[in-house]
Structure formats: C-alpha cells, structure tokens
Curated annotation (Swiss-Prot):
Modified residues (Phosphoserine): 49-50
Sample GO molecular function, one term: RNA binding
KW ATP-binding (keyword) present: no
Stated name of the protein: Large ribosomal subunit protein eL22
Record localization: Cytoplasm; Nucleus, Nucleolus
Keywords: Cytoplasm, Nucleus, Phosphoprotein, Ribonucleoprotein, Ribosomal protein
Xref: PANTHER family: 60S RIBOSOMAL PROTEIN L22, LARGE RIBOSOMAL SUBUNIT PROTEIN EL22A-RELATED
GO cellular component: cytosol; cytosolic large ribosomal subunit; nucleolus; preribosome
Family stated for the protein in its record: Belongs to the eukaryotic ribosomal protein eL22 family.
UniProt GO BP: cytoplasmic translation
Job description of the protein: Component of the ribosome, a large ribonucleoprotein complex responsible for the synthesis of proteins in the cell. The small ribosomal subunit (SSU) binds messenger RNAs (mRNAs) and translates the encoded message by selecting cognate aminoacyl-transfer RNA (tRNA) molecules. The large subunit (LSU) contains the ribosomal catalytic site termed the peptidyl transferase center (PTC), which catalyzes the formation of peptide bonds, thereby polymerizing the amino acids delivered by tRNAs into a polypeptide chain.
Record note on quaternary structure: Component of the large ribosomal subunit (LSU). Mature yeast ribosomes consist of a small (40S) and a large (60S) subunit. The 40S small subunit contains 1 molecule of ribosomal RNA (18S rRNA) and at least 33 different proteins. The large 60S subunit contains 3 rRNA molecules (25S, 5.8S and 5S rRNA) and at least 46 different proteins.
InterPro entries found in the cross-reference section: Ribosomal_eL22 (IPR002671), Ribosomal_eL22_sf (IPR038526)
Length: 117
C-alpha cells in the first residue's frame, strides 16, 4: 500500500472585529506574533511557503496552511497573545464554525446587589 502525496490546504480565519472596534486589540501586532511563533517541523520562524499569515481587512487574520496544521494550535497561540497583552480577562476565543475563530467579550452580568450600592 503506497500513500499518495496529496497537498493539504487549510484556511483559518481569526475575527477580532469587536476588539478592534473598541481599539483594545492590535491586529498588526497579532499578525507579527503569529509569524514569529508558529512552528513548522518543530522550529519557529520556519514558515516558508507552507504557512501563510495575512490580514483580511482591518480586523481579520487569515492563516493558510499547506501542511497538516491544527486549529487548536492557532487557538492556543491566540490565547497566549491575549495573556501576554493582558486581554485574557476580557476576551475569549470562540470557534463559530469550522476554521473560523472569533474574539468575543465575556458575558458579564451585573447583579442587583451591586447596582443598588
């Protein structure tokens, strides 16, 4: 049994529209962070043509991988970026559909006790 050498191509989108509109999230810094931190064959800075990180519009990042690449790894790197920039307390990473991740605010419900005081 011989395996065919097929080309795998995955596209992942990270949508940070809400955070960018509130001016608390820098898409350019996040794009640079991903380029610096994504590992290919166990090495950072080894993207080459196998992984392409680009900006789509002013608030979306597209990662196109021509190798086996996990969406969970992208989510992990996004969480690390949020933690590094002290945004993890306000934003979370949610998968809205296959290959699409969105940065959303946590739902904070203020109780009646706090409003009266």
């Amino acid at each position: 049994m011989v395996k065919k050498n097929t080309k795998v191509s995955n596209k992942y989108i990270i949508d940070a529209t809400a955070a960018v509109n509130d001016k608390i999230f820098d898409v350019a810094a996040f794009e640079k962070y991903l380029i610096d931190r994504i590992k290919v064959d166990g090495k950072t800075g080894n993207l080459g043509s196998s992984v392409v990180v680009s900006r789509e519009g002013s608030s979306k990042i597209a990662v196109i991988a021509h190798i086996d690449f996990s969406g969970r790894y992208l989510k992990y790197l996004t969480k690390k970026f949020l933690k590094k920039h002290s945004l993890r307390d306000w934003l979370r990473v949610v998968s809205t559909k296959k290959g699409v991740y969105e940065l959303r605010y946590y739902n904070v419900v203020v109780g009646n006790d706090e409003e009266e005081q």
